[in-house]
């Protein structure tokens, strides 16, 4: 049997079931087995590993994962795809498809039911563009015990995740993801290897979870509030952004100026120039004056 991820096999499956693509679900099926293998290679899936997939579509990536992993669990929100997946994944007895929205599912419960304690598990997915960021944050913030993520996403979002200080892509998203993970751009993927073709190119991004966050902060919630406030208006200085947008901090520009100067950060700098370490230092100084 031919791999699912070929133009002809994908076309045959779609026509057989009369499947119509839903733009609202970001459905773009990958038709290049080489790209799928690059994804699975970088996930370093072994014969004892587990994999969580989100949005399996007709099972193209699922199939490649099932060939290598001990167990694959795939979340699929679209009920119309279930009979297709029943057929395409029939040769593989190590796949469980769960018809749930991963953003609403109790992922810890599923994880504990489907995987062995201490098993090496990766999230491997061709993520729908419109929910890439919410999915990553849900799984990171809920501290799902996975080794990391290898995910296909819109190239523009991938660039933001991997961005360095001082670049136009760098922002609160870069800091939030890099706080929890080491980010690596594996490859850019042209839009031509999808059916239907999206309007943008994609990238494969690998995120390996850090044993502990990259910086130590006194108050994690406040740290992210400082970061978000610093990027509220990109063209404004830190002084302006923090004095206008940092909730829970006194509206006292003199105090703010003094704290910034004490930690060695020029109040006239913009948020995009600060490293994650500088944000941690700043947050740890500001939190001492937070309104209770």
From Swiss-Prot:
Subcellular location field: Cytoplasm
Cross-referenced SUPFAM superfamilies: S-adenosyl-L-methionine-dependent methyltransferases
GO biological process, one term: rRNA methylation
Top-level class of the enzyme under EC nomenclature: transferase
Enzyme Commission (EC) number: 2.1.1.182
Listed InterPro entries: KsgA/Erm, rRNA_Ade_diMease-like_C, rRNA_Ade_Mease_Trfase_CS, rRNA_Ade_methylase_Trfase_N, rRNA_adenine_dimethylase, SAM-dependent_MTases_sf
Highest taxon in the source lineage: Bacteria
Alphabetical UniProt keywords: Cytoplasm, Methyltransferase, RNA-binding, rRNA processing, S-adenosyl-L-methionine, Transferase
Primary location class: cytoplasm
MF annotations from Gene Ontology: 16S rRNA (adenine(1518)-N(6)/adenine(1519)-N(6))-dimethyltransferase activity; RNA binding; rRNA (adenine-N6,N6-)-dimethyltransferase activity
Record SMART domains: rADc (SM00650)
Catalytic activity: adenosine(1518)/adenosine(1519) in 16S rRNA + 4 S-adenosyl-L-methionine = N(6)-dimethyladenosine(1518)/N(6)-dimethyladenosine(1519) in 16S rRNA + 4 S-adenosyl-L-homocysteine + 4 H(+)
A cellular-component GO term for this protein: cytosol
Matching CDD domains: AdoMet_MTases (cd02440)
Residues the record lists as binding S-adenosyl-L-methionine: 28, 30, 55, 76, 101, 126
Pfam families: RrnaAD
Function (record text): Specifically dimethylates two adjacent adenosines (A1518 and A1519) in the loop of a conserved hairpin near the 3'-end of 16S rRNA in the 30S particle. May play a critical role in biogenesis of 30S subunits.
NCBIfam families documented for this protein: ksgA (TIGR00755)
UniProt similarity note: Belongs to the class I-like SAM-binding methyltransferase superfamily. rRNA adenine N(6)-methyltransferase family. RsmA subfamily.
Entry protein name: Ribosomal RNA small subunit methyltransferase A
């Amino acid at each position: 049997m031919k791999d699912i991820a070929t133009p002809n096999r994908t076309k045959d499956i779609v026509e057989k079931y009369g499947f119509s693509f839903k733009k609202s679900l970001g459905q773009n099926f990958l038709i290049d087995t080489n790209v799928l293998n690059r994804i699975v290679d970088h996930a370093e899936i072994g014969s004892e590993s587990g994999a969580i997939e989100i949005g399996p579509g007709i099972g193209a990536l699922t199939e490649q994962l099932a060939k290598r992993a001990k167990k694959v669990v795939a979340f699929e929100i679209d009920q119309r795809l279930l009979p297709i997946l029943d057929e395409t994944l029939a040769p593989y007895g190590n796949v469980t498809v769960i018809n749930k929205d991963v953003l609403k599912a109790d992922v810890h419960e599923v994880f504990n039911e489907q995987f062995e304690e201490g098993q090496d598990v990766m999230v491997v997915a061709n993520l729908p563009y419109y929910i890439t960021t919410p999915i990553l944050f849900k799984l990171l913030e809920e501290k799902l015990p996975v080794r990391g993520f290898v995910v296909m996403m819109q190239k523009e979002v991938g660039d933001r995740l991997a961005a360095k200080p001082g670049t136009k892509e760098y922002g609160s998203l870069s800091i939030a993801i890099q706080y929890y993970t080491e980010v690596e751009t594996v490859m850019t993927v042209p839009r031509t290897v999808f059916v239907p073709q999206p309007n943008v190119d994609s990238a494969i991004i690998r995120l390996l979870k850090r044993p502990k966050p990259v910086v130590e902060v006194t108050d994690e919630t406040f740290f992210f509030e400082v970061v978000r406030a610093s990027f509220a208006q990109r063209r404004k200085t830190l002084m302006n952004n923090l004095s206008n947008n940092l909730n829970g901090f006194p509206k006292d520009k003199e105090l703010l100026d003094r704290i910034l100067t004490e930690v060695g950060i020029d109040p006239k700098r913009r948020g995009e120039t600060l490293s994650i370490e500088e944000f941690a230092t700043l947050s740890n100084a500001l939190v001492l004056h937070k309104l209770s």
